[in-house]
Amino acid sequence: MLNLVNLFIFFPILLFLHCFFIFLFKKWLGPFGTFYSSLLVFLTSLILTLNELYFILLYGEYFFIDFGRWFFCLDLIDSHLVFCVDSLSLIASALVLTLTSLALYFGIEYMYREAFINRLLYLLNLFATSVIFLFFCYDFFLILISWECIGLFSFLLVNFYSMRIYTIKAALKTFVFSRISDLFMFFTFILSILVFNTTDLSLIFLQVPFFSFHYLFIGNVAVHFLTLFSFCLSTSGVIKAAQFFFHVWLPDAMEAPTPASALIHSSTLVVAGIFLVIRFSTLFEFTVLTNYYLALLGAATLSFSSVTAIFQNDIKKLVAYSTISQIGYLVCGCGFCCYEEVLIYLIIHALNKAFLFILVGYTVHFFNGNTDMRQMGGFYIYSFDIAVLFLGVCLNLAGLPYSAGFFGKEFLLYQLLRDDFLSLIVRSCWLVSFFFTPVYMFILIFVVIYGPKKGLINTYYDFWSFKWVHEYYLLILKGNMLSKNTNLKSVNHQNHLTTYAFQFTIATCRTTTYILVTFWCFFIFFGETFFSIIFNFSTLTDSINSDFFFLFKTHTVFFMNSSSQFLGDYLFSFILFFSTCSFIFLLNLKFTLNYKYLTHLWILDLIFMITTLGLLWSTSTWSYIPFILITTLYFLKFNR
């Protein structure tokens, strides 16, 4: 066990060494070598993370390792290389490693023809490494350095297309707000040195109860020290999370490449800000005013951003304001001291929003780089599987009942069931968000995906090794048409959309689609049960239960029994939705090879659809006989 822990502790250093390796040999590796080496290192680190997380959750342990002093300055700064491996850092690292691996795959596929793709992959590696170092550091000086690195690499990623004037403006705006966040973090670091006389978080947490009545005097004004300390710390985190008054940099930061947006603005960067608040949760138990500040700020953010998202015409800015609104839930939850629920919804949101950014990237590339939703539409005609995934992710983020997004919001909303003036204010803001969140999600669905076709498409061709698949099915299409005595030239013209639909569906999105289906199906249906194991995450000092704020936790969803009606409805909805999705994928396969428009269905297709849906609602075993018969005829006609 100790050897495994030592190996795991060194895996952030392994990530740093890997970044140094690909920087030295970037000309020899090329984009594919950089991609495969990065993917190998991140997947290996992910396996180590999950293995260690299993043992820590099983035995309820944590590991605190001090490698000794590494920086000393005038008896003020005595920094040690201190790392803490607990379930909180492991869960956050597993999330970042998973999404980074997905972003790397999407990045190499999406930007293969772009210039400086090596620089993009290198910056993605450095950014993810900095965030993971932040998760494991247990010394304030190391946290400050990691925080600065995160701001630097996010600025470089936003400024990737540095020849564009709008990109330069967005990068400068990102840099300014990042400096403001770093300024608050540096001021917190100075306070920890002057008052706590240490930068070790374990020693800081041990001293927190003794400073609950400690005041700093600025002239004749007395300021509560822990309130000032927690205010600066939380402000540094909420600026990174793009909350109200500090949100203006995030929509402009969409000038970054789509893989960087999927990694930074949807999951990793906001994870860092919320993680900082959860890590210092012991401190916030003694600072009531800071909790009120976080609750009101998060409530104002989620209501303001949900209303603003409706008036956006740019698809990336709509998703950006959606991210700001959803992070408002997390900040508001931190204000109510329900850190476990925040951690659950953080994972749900990060996974779904990263997948949504990837789907938006495919959509934008499909429409020749156009991001104006008024010129989009009819996307389901060309790639119906991506349209189905788009629908599922948007419904999950909108809070579809029985989905993971619904349960995550329910846990946070349960903390507001108290007759208090602040609770009523926050609840009113949540009601505004609950109304407008499905509205802008359905705008995204019915304008871009299922709306009328208005824009031009991009005949994108895959560069991977499965070109024979496309050529094989293209020959099948030509052979079927030639067998009907049709001119080959007219065949190519008539089946251009069909050929492109297959090309985009099978070649461009093959592995990414399967990954999205797997993760989406798991987290939308079974993720709620899995998240129950992470509630009691271990820390060096136990969180102190406080009666100052709203702390009322009774999660009835986690205690469902097999005979409950709720569980029966839950499983029935899963079977219905999963079977419907399977049917849509099957229909999409047939549409891809034979149809130009989805509305051109055969009679047998309609019978198959009616029989399948009737079977789902029927309890009789005799209904399986026509289902099997119709399915057999369907596949015989399909394979003929």
Predicted regions and their residues:
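Cytoplasmic/organellar membrane-interface segments at the starts of transmembrane helices
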Residues: 381-386, 447-633, 640
